[in-house]
């Protein structure tokens, strides 16, 4: 952490993003308190999910993790895992269903939203674009261009939102996946993400020039370090701040991505499985003839 201080406070803590997220959070809490006595209130569970989403979003994009992600590939993969696997489901769960209905059911939004949240399309788009992003040529291009970097980051985030929507949303007017379908959906999602991680994990050499070439690395650092600070820092290459060998750092990144993915997906699998079992038992109990229920009691 002390080594990162050479890049300055703005690069480490992104105060502008902090202020934006703080303002959004304050607005959310204002409506939470104002609507506490109304039927369409924001529940305590929704508030916790939303606040957690803001916290994880800042941790991924505003804390030193963002700066470290330009220095170490392993930190980059942790950042991606949090941004795309942790924040979207918390954000969906943190906004009440009635508010989602007001947003989604607008005539200009509903057809597009319905298409991109179709389970198969959402799965293929998120995992496909995420995998393409980590093709070395594309990755190095995006990492050194501010426009492409912003575009791809937002694109994958939106696709991650679409991917999580069928699993998490509580909008009754929209189709709900059954418990069994949700279990299959998560397992398919995990399988589709595996090839990209395996390619990185089992590569015999460093894949990304933005972590090996000092000139490209310095160019990539300009995306997160203010221009006035870049001129004051004597940059020699990523090895000045990364003590891990490049190949080991790359392999560690793929492993960290899979570990976080397994934790998140495993948690959802457990929750969905027990919810499904509970519903099936309740359903079976309702369908049993009266004399069977009397016999059991």
Curated annotation (Swiss-Prot):
Disulfide bonds: none
Annotated membrane topology: Multi-pass membrane protein
GO cellular component term, pick one: plasma membrane
TM helices/strands, residue ranges: 11-31, 48-68, 80-100, 119-139, 147-167, 183-203, 254-274
UniProtKB keywords: Cell membrane, Membrane, Transmembrane, Transmembrane helix
Location of this chain's protein in the cell: Cell membrane
Name of the protein in its database record: Protein CtaG
Lineage: Bacteria, Bacillati, Bacillota, Bacilli, Bacillales
């Amino acid at each position: 952490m002390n080594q990162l201080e050479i890049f300055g406070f703005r690069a480490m803590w992104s105060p502008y993003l902090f202020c934006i997220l703080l303002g959004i959070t304050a607005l959310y809490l204002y409506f939470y308190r104002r609507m506490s006595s109304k039927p369409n209130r924001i529940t305590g569970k929704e508030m916790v999910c939303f606040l957690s989403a803001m916290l994880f979003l800042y941790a991924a994009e505003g804390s030193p993790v963002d700066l470290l992600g330009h220095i170490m590939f392993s930190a980059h993969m942790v950042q991606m895992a949090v941004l795309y696997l942790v924040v979207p489901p918390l954000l969906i769960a943190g906004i009440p269903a009635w508010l989602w209905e007001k947003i989604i059911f607008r005539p200009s939004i509903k057809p597009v939203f319905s298409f991109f949240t179709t389970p198969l399309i959402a799965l293929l788009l998120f995992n496909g674009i995420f995998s393409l992003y980590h093709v070395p040529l594309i990755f190095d291009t995006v990492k050194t261009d501010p426009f492409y970097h912003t575009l791809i980051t937002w694109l994958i985030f939106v696709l991650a939102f679409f991917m999580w929507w069928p699993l998490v949303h509580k909008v009754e007017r929209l189709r709900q996946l059954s418990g069994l379908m949700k279990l299959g959906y998560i397992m398919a999602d995990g399988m589709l993400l595996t090839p990209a991680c395996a390619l990185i994990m089992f590569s015999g050499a460093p894949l990304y020039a933005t972590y090996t070439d000092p000139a490209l690395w310095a160019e990539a650092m300009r995306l997160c370090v203010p221009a006035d600070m870049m001129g004051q820092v004597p940059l020699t290459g990523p090895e000045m701040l990364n003590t891990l060998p490049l190949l080991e750092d790359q392999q560690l990144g793929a492993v960290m991505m899979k570990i976080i993915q397994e934790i998140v997906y495993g948690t959802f699998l457990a929750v969905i499985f027990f919810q499904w079992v509970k519903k099936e038992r309740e359903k079976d109990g309702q369908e049993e003839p009266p004399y069977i229920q009397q016999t059991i009691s």
